[in-house]
Amino acid sequence: MTRLSSRRSLVAGALATALLGGLAAAAPSSAAEPTITNDCLLSVPEPGSQAPVKICYTLFQPAGASAERPVPVVMHGHGWGGSRTRTVSPDFKPLLDAGYGILSFDQRGFGESGGRAHTLQVDIEGHDVLRLVDLIAAQPWVRKEGGKDDPVLGAMGGSYGGGYQYLGAFADQLYNKRNRFDALAPEITWNDLKQALAPDEVARSTWLTLLTAVSTQDNDERAQRAFAYGAATGLWADGPAAQALDADMDAYFERTGPRWHVAQGRQLDIPTLVRQGTNDTLFNLNEAVRNFDSTLTPKARSRSMLIGYNGGHILPGLANSAVPRGASTNGDPCSAALGGGWEALRKAFFDRNLKKDDSVTIPGLGQYHLATTDAKRCVTLDSVAPTTTVALGTVATPVVAGAPLQLELGAGPMTVAGMPRVDALVTAAGAHAKAFFGLAVGTSPADATVVHNQLMPLHEEVPLVGSERSVELPGVAVDVPAGQKLFLTVTPFVDQFHGNGSRTPGALVLRDTKVQLPVVPTPVAVAPAR
């Protein structure tokens, strides 16, 4: 998926698989320059076709790498609508200089690769990634372990380029009963793509509008129709709408993320450096927490960490929402504190897990490290679960139009860091009743500002009375200073979900409302380096 902001964009089967001849172009190498090869291989056909699809790549062989001096390789994937990196970029240079090979590839449907994008279906794009792994393993200058077709292999990339990492690792386990990835470094990606794009069946219509616009020619036609429907209506394409569009999105997205693999009983025993944007309004922090908590085995989690930074997918013009008032800042104090910056931390993580360099020590493994909303400090946690309950009683909000409610939860100084939620008995008078919930900070309801610019919906498709509901709020890290207060924001409208208000007038009434807050009483110590 695409980060559409002013910052640098992330958008942007054995080797019997035939390589397409005549496309290789090796750059002259010197003592300090890598050898760069551009080529394509053939992968599985598109659904309904028998013609193989070409997947194109750029392979960087670092200076000095040879069969006598083999080196690890790091795969790189681009974001939605982007293409592979063909030159020595600032991201690549430190790794190449340190003796890592790199393979960057055009994901199916993008760049020079053929086919259409299927949002990383395991039975389509999963095979693309595995054939690239086979290609890497066939290079004589690549270090092997556990067999000649098992390269020492890492992976990096963000958004769609983070999704392929989980896809490839799980596909290797599913189809080959193997685990050839040795370290992953996914950024701003998803656990459950359907839940990310349409939490509680409420389509992120503003994002779907942009995602549709940047991929009209590249996307699977069914997904394209469903994205356009969600952008126009604010509803997820299921039921009768899915039949009319010939696009059952529940079934389509079922196998496109880690959640499905975990539900099938699979986990990854791979050290993983997870990085997610706390103010990412497409794939919020919750997606990364679910990946960290459920996708990794306990052993892998003890060798991994989650970094929450202030950044990610930011809507153009909506970095600070107007309705309700929201704010976000940029910064990554956790990567700075733990490794001297994200690129340096990632390289250290690869050095430790790919080069097996025991001299590299990394503090904070097995923990969550979250940037506060002002990006001034890093909160380290052993758990992101709620610790404190605040009872609010009855809360009533209109569902078509109305001013946001700001309900006081507590006074500063206090720190809230982790995964809050709202539990209540919900009554909805009309169909498709919706409201949006988040945390806010201010001196009063009049100036309360939504933390990390993040809200999540509650959507009742049919009228109901007194049904138990839990609303998962966006993951947060916020210091509430003395003189300010923490509020629960409840609003019938939010500009990030345009056109998503309820269709019929009425109200949502929440009784016995309890807000579960992850209050951090004292700073948690960073786990010792190891």
Protein language model regions, located:
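Secretory targeting and sorting signals
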Residues: 1-31
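N-terminal cap/lid segment of alpha/beta-hydrolase-fold proteins
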Residues: 32-69
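Glycine/threonine-rich phosphate-binding loop and adjacent beta-strand/alpha-helix elements that clamp
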Residues: 34-47, 355-530
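Gly/Ser-rich "nucleophile elbow"/oxyanion-hole loop immediately N-terminal to the catalytic nucleophile
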Residues: 63-70, 118-124, 131-159, 175
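Short substrate-entry loop that stabilizes the transition state in hydrolases
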Residues: 65-71, 76-114, 281-284
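Accessory cap/linker subdomain of secreted extracellular hydrolases
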Residues: 97, 126, 138, 145-146, ...
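Short beta-strand/loop motif that positions the catalytic acidic residue
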Residues: 268, 274-276
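Short alpha-helix in the alpha/beta-hydrolase fold that links the catalytic acid
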Residues: 284-294
